[in-house]
């Protein structure tokens, strides 16, 4: 069985957030984490793998190379492989299109996503991805 877990990289909620003079989010001194809902999805996938060793877990992130440490963390937690679509995640629609194209090119038996990311709290990516894949 092949499981795909889609993860987002979000600021740790304990980080002090600030903005630049141009009103842009200042990433300096911000710790980024795997979103807690995506972390939960990964934990459930690993639990399934512990019960059935033939399960293969893949991680997917739409983002830039700065997210690579979190993909490596996901591998350390128990994922077998990690993929990153190298693109700035502009909005939920853009991310959903990228995820759905990746899923169409690969054959997964189960797709797990968090209910929402804690940075924008939109909760749209999984719905949009499902609609694009006619699920």
Q: Where are these predicted regions, by residue range?
A:
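N-terminal glycine-rich FAD/FM-binding segment characteristic of electron-transfer flavoproteins
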Residues: 1-135
